[in-house]
């Protein structure tokens, strides 16, 4: 089977410099969703017709199995499909999809393809409570499709028809070339419409069959930011419903965004307004607090992530406790039972089993052993303005509050670092490290006061 995806439109109503089909839905271009669905049908040829912003669109979705045809002038859907003809296998049927209709299920398309076997012409239709603005499917007394009539050309009786054309079709490819060549542009837009092909197919004696989707929203397209937002919420609710079926507890299924792949174990609980991006895995008994953003991360069993935590490119072991207001950046690796608390940032660092950094700390480019306590206000000074250096803290170290560790530096096992200490040399095992200071108390001191006006 050939699949052609039309993606050449300008998208004027989007009011954006970005080509319409590249606007994101769930964090990925609209067109990428359509291509992924098309791939599940295992086409022999997959052709995307580009036009407006052609180079940008091609760069965004380029892949070995995707070919591109260019529609230099936007002269209608029929003209667009015609540009793809040289890339198609004439012995195979062709399914035509749209790059701005991202939610059509593969099962819906497969039913249409099955209905159109043996050289039939297939149309995906949908029945609407309010079909205003759409082309109507006109049938004869026996129920056979005779034509598609546009709203402006429909008679009062035809306007009562609730079954409408979605534009998605399956057609014999060998005949399609002839039918497209016979199209006329005698309409208000001066364009060649793919919908006109159905009458040519009927005149040529081809049986026209129809199929319908399970859900009306499968055929909704995007022509404005409002429609894009509507489809985003539909998609996210579908994702949420699937998570609920899998046993995930969602505090509010309407307030979760998954912009990638989210895999959850048993008894996972997710509070409101959480965003998951890229590939995220949550193991059994993970609890996510409200307003968290988690991207490309794995979270071990029994972990608790408190509210307003941001995690990006991190790996968390089992029974860790994170947040609230923590930030784990790429390369952060936490062993089992590690704690990273409020206003702590971890970047490209390993935190060992049972170690804790509970308050107001920056840990960057560091290797921290097991059972280490990092006091509030501790900073690993990892950057000299040009180069990054690592800090190594071995097992069972106690780091007092307001400590600076100037990398590269190693702190040996069992060391105690007093509060307010700056470490710039390696520290041997088991010692107390401190910067000796003198505390002075001056009697008779009078604090300055503001003069009253």
Curated annotation (Swiss-Prot):
Its EC number is 2.7.7.23, 2.3.1.157. Residues 226-246 are annotated as: Linker. Pathway: Nucleotide-sugar biosynthesis; UDP-N-acetyl-alpha-D-glucosamine biosynthesis; N-acetyl-alpha-D-glucosamine 1-phosphate from alpha-D-glucosamine 6-phosphate (route II): step 2/2; Nucleotide-sugar biosynthesis; UDP-N-acetyl-alpha-D-glucosamine biosynthesis; UDP-N-acetyl-alpha-D-glucosamine from N-acetyl-alpha-D-glucosamine 1-phosphate: step 1/1; Bacterial outer membrane biogenesis; LPS lipid A biosynthesis. Residues 1-225 are annotated as: Pyrophosphorylase. Pfam families: Hexapep (PF00132), NTP_transf_3 (PF12804). Acetyl-CoA binds at residues 376, 382-383, 401, 419. One of its GO terms (biological process) is cell morphogenesis. It is found in: Cytoplasm. Mg(2+) binds at residues 100, 223. The active site is at 359 (proton acceptor). Residues 247-453 are annotated as: N-acetyltransferase. Binds 1 Mg(2+) ion per subunit. Its cofactor is Mg(2+). Homotrimer. NCBIfam families: glmU. In the N-terminal section; belongs to the N-acetylglucosamine-1-phosphate uridyltransferase family. In the C-terminal section; belongs to the transferase hexapeptide repeat family. This is Bifunctional protein GlmU. It comes from Burkholderia cenocepacia (strain ATCC BAA-245 / DSM 16553 / LMG 16656 / NCTC 13227 / J2315 / CF5610).
């Amino acid at each position: 089977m050939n699949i052609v995806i039309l993606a050449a439109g300008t998208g004027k109503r989007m009011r954006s410099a970005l080509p319409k089909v590249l606007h994101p839905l769930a964090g990925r271009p609209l067109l990428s969703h359509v291509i992924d669905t098309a791939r599940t049908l295992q086409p022999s040829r997959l052709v995307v017709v580009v036009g407006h912003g052609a180079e940008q669109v091609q760069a965004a979705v380029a892949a070995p199995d995707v070919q591109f045809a260019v529609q230099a002038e936007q002269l209608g859907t029929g003209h667009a499909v015609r540009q793809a003809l040289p890339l198609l296998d004439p012995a195979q049927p062709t399914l035509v999809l749209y790059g701005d209709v991202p939610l059509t299920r593969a099962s819906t398309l497969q039913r249409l393809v099955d209905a159109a076997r043996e050289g039939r012409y297939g149309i995906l239709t949908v029945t609407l409570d309010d079909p205003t603005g759409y082309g109507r499917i006109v049938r004869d007394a026996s129920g056979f499709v005779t034509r598609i009539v546009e709203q402006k050309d429909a008679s009062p009786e035809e306007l009562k028809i609730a079954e409408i054309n979605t534009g998605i079709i399956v057609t014999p490819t060998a005949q399609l070339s002839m039918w497209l060549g016979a199209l006329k542009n005698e309409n208000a837009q001066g364009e060649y419409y793919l919908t006109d092909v159905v009458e040519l197919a009927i005149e040529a004696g081809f049986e026209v069959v129809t199929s319908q989707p399970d859900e009306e929203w499968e055929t909704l397209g995007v022509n404005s930011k409002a429609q894009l937002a509507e489809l985003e919420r539909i998609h996210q609710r579908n994702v949420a419903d699937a998570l609920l079926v899998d046993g995930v507890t969602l505090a509010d299924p309407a307030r979760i965004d998954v912009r990638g792949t989210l895999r959850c174990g048993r008894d996972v609980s997710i509070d409101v307004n959480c965003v998951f991006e890229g590939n995220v895995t949550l193991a059994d008994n993970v609890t996510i607090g409200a307003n968290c953003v988690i991207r490309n991360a794995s979270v071990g069993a029994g972990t608790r992530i408190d509210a307003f935590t941001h995690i990006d490119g991190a790996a968390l072991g089992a029974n860790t406790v994170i947040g609230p207001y923590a930030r784990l950046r790429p390369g952060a690796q936490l062993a089992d039972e590690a704690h990273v608390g409020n206003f702590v940032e971890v970047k490209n660092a390993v935190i060992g089993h049972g170690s804790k950094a509970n308050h107001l700390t920056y840990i960057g480019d560091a290797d921290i052993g097991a059972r280490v306590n990092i006091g509030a206000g501790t900073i690993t000074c990892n950057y000299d303005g040009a180069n990054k250096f690592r800090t190594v803290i071995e097992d069972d170290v106690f780091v007092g509050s307001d400590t600076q560790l100037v990398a590269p530096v190693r702190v040996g096992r069992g060391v105690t670092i007093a509060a307010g200490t700056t470490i710039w040399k390696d520290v041997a095992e088991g010692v107390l490290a401190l910067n000796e200071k003198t505390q002075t108390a001056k009697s008779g001191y009078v604090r300055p006061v503001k003069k009253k006006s």
